[in-house]
Regions:
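Active-site-lining helix/loop region of Rossmann-like oxidoreductase modules
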Residues: 167-229
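Rossmann-like NAD(P)-binding element
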Residues: 63-120
Length: 229
């Protein structure tokens, strides 16, 4: 019931053009870049990390819509939560915050299993369990997860947002129609074109180094995704 209430609140906010509160779990390069775009689009954002004091410079430069806090504070704050952490830390987030995340309207999973950081055995295990997406759903039971922004470099986001001409496409994967709709709206607001490539099982393809990695138009993403099913 709480999750439905959250989704109803978000639906009303989007219908009336009201901002959504967004919590960023992991305000490193990717989380910081995405959060910055959301602030510039008019949404209040709480950035979080293990050491929120280190985020003072980031939030000071973004003005009154940005604040820093702990991971728990960012999750409590957000109608929408963006998780941009080393993938090996996802289990820890699930153990501590799965209940709270299940009550959100949308959880955007930006995290990727990367061998050089998380270890080759860990990445192999994620693959054997169906890949990122299905594993995130297992670790965050009940959360309305959409994988997105998994394969565009953080340093490129600001320059690609709202680019002239055809927008850059962002492949997304999810199983919750309402969460997908919220994600699509937010992605368009910050200057990209969302492309639903399938359910969370397709999340295994939304990582760097795959055909869907890198920068593509929406039409190119649809063509590539069609060859992967």
């Amino acid at each position: 019931m709480v999750a439905l209430a959250a989704q109803s609140h978000v639906a009303v906010a989007q219908a009336t053009g009201s901002p959504l509160k967004i919590g960023i779990v992991g305000a490193g390069r990717e989380g910081g870049a995405l959060g910055t775009l959301f602030v510039k689009a008019g949404h209040p954002v709480t950035f979080s990390s293990r050491h929120p004091d280190n985020l003072k410079g980031l939030v000071a430069g973004l003005g009154p819509l940005a604040q820093a806090g702990t991971v728990a504070e960012a999750i409590a704050f957000g109608d929408v939560v963006v998780i941009a952490i080393p993938y090996a830390a996802m289990e820890e987030i699930g153990k501590a915050h799965a209940g709270a995340l299940a009550k959100k309207a949308l959880v955007i999973d930006v995290s990727n299993p990367i061998a050089r950081r998380d270890g080759e055995d860990f990445v192999k295990s994620v693959g054997e369990q169906g890949g990122a997406g299905l594993v995130t759903a297992k670790l965050l039971p009940g959360a309305p997860i959409v994988r997105a922004f998994n394969a565009i470099g953080s340093g490129r986001l600001a320059g690609l947002a709202h680019r002239a001409g055809e927008p850059v496409g962002v492949p997304i994967a999810g199983d919750d129609p309402k969460a997908i709709a919220v994600a699509q709206s937010l992605i368009r607001e910050i200057g990209f074109e969302p492309v639903l490539v399938g359910g969370l099982a397709m999340g295994r393809h939304l990582v760097p180094g795959t055909p869907l990695g890198g920068e593509h138009t929406a039409a190119e993403i649809r063509q590539i995704a069609g060859s992967l099913h």
